């Protein structure tokens, strides 16, 4: 067993060996290394053909038209292009946007930027299970609302939003609907026709593809217009200029092809591992599972261990590669803003760990993880005076702490 055990698949996945093997063929003199935009010779034609194939593979996973796929450097850029692109193009129709408080920073920070530019953003509070209430979303809509941006699967707590219902609502109100699907593509089925989504952000490295490549799905019927954020040679139908990285695009295409073929297999494997981990820790005292347990992907388990400091638990679990919150924010000592939005207090939010598993995780690794978690939590609680007070029946919320 390789230590530390990797249980941080929501941060990134290892590249599937089949994907890596394919990518290598598009880099060197022996392979297809040409620029897809070179129209005058075979090197360019072959590269363009490889890009077209990848575009088809990505579109197939979404039940989309290949012409609706725009390549970007990743989901962060896709979020920026979608949100700023819509805001700047449709600003004559209105300047109001709706999103939720539990979105990824790539969405929230983009919204903050638009607020500085004079747009008005409504941030919806999720329910305590992490899901957005459709009635609250509808109530927030106004005549000048131009965009709704709600993620499909949350990166910290793994809950799955009812995208089809939100899409129906947005379509009936003629509001553009953007979805960040970085955490759901390849994990759950996505059908853009059924879901009535206008824009979808995609990432390759969350689906066993390479880092540094992503895509934005841009609906053609009804046509969605965007203002480009990256200017230059007019690549990607003018949406996103820049030479296309053939090897990365081929990697993303292959990763999405495999994801489509093995979707059910991967899902069942993750579910088995998640249930195994849950069964191994659910009888522990003062343990909370964060987020709805039914409407969530099985690849994620976010757990709060009360009376244990999250940072010290991470240190104690040095043989497990896990995180507290998302990789993008886990470097900060602030409690997770996602868990705070669910109504968890600072202490509980601070004591949470995200376990995320995937294609290459084994049952033996989960069993080893359970053992480590139980020992570490018991050891840390044994050192905690708060744990002693809790065991003595003291309600810690009513204690008046003296400030010396």
Swiss-Prot record:
The prosthetic group or cofactor this protein requires is: pyridoxal 5'-phosphate
Q: Name one GO cellular component term.
A: L-cysteine desulfurase complex
Q: What does it catalyze? A: (sulfur carrier)-H + L-cysteine = (sulfur carrier)-SH + L-alanine
Q: Which Gene3D superfamilies match?
A: Aspartate Aminotransferase, domain 1, Type I PLP-dependent aspartate aminotransferase-like (Major domain)
Keyword entries, A-Z: 2Fe-2S, Cytoplasm, Iron, Iron-sulfur, Metal-binding, Pyridoxal phosphate, Transferase
Where, per UniProt, does this protein localize? Cytoplasm
Output one GO MF annotation: 2 iron, 2 sulfur cluster binding
> Could you identify this protein by its name?
Cysteine desulfurase IscS
Q: Which organism is it from?
A: Vibrio cholerae serotype O1 (strain ATCC 39315 / El Tor Inaba N16961)
């Amino acid at each position: 067993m390789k230590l530390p055990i990797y249980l941080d698949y929501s941060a990134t996945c290892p590249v599937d060996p089949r994907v890596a093997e394919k990518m290598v063929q598009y880099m060197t003199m022996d392979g297809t290394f040409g620029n897809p935009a070179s129209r005058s010779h075979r090197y360019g034609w072959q590269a363009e053909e490889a890009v077209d194939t990848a575009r088809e593979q990505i579109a197939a996973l979404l039940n989309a038209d290949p012409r609706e796929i725009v390549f970007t450097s990743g989901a962060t850029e896709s979020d920026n292009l979608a949100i700023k692109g819509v805001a700047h193009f449709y600003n004559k129709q209105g300047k109001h946007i709706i999103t939720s408080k539990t979105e990824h920073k790539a969405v929230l920070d983009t919204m903050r930027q638009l607020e500085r530019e004079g747009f008005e953003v409504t941030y919806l509070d999720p329910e305590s299970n992490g899901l957005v209430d459709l009635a609250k979303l509808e109530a927030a809509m106004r005549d000048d609302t131009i965009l709704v941006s709600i993620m499909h699967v949350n990166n910290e707590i793994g809950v799955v939003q009812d995208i089809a219902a939100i899409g129906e609502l947005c379509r009936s109100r003629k509001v553009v609907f953007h979805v960040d699907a970085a955490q759901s593509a390849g994990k759950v089925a996505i059908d853009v026709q059924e879901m009535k989504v206008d824009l979808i952000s995609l990432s390759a490295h969350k689906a066993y593809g390479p880092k540094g490549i992503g895509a934005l799905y841009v609906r053609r019927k009804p046509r969605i217009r965007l203002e480009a954020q990256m200017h230059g040679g007019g690549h990607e139908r003018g949406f996103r200029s820049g030479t296309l990285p053939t090897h990365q695009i081929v990697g993303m295409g292959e990763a999405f092809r495999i994801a489509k073929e093995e979707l059910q297999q991967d899902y069942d494997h993750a579910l088995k591992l998640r249930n195994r981990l849950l069964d191994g820790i659910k009888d522990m005292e003062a343990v909370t599972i964060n987020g709805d347990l039914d409407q969530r992907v099985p690849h994620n388990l976010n757990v709060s261990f009360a009376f244990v400091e999250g940072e010290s638990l991470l240190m104690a679990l040095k043989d497990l590669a896990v995180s507290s919150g998302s990789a993008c924010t886990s470097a900060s000592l602030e409690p997770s803003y996602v868990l705070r939005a669910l109504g968890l207090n600072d202490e509980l939010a601070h004591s949470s760990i995200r376990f995320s598993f995937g294609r290459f995780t084994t049952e033996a690794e989960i069993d080893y993880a359970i053992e480590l978690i139980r020992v570490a939590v018991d050891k840390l609680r044994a050192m905690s005076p708060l744990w002693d007070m809790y065991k003595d029946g003291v309600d810690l919320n009513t204690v008046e702490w003296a400030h010396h």
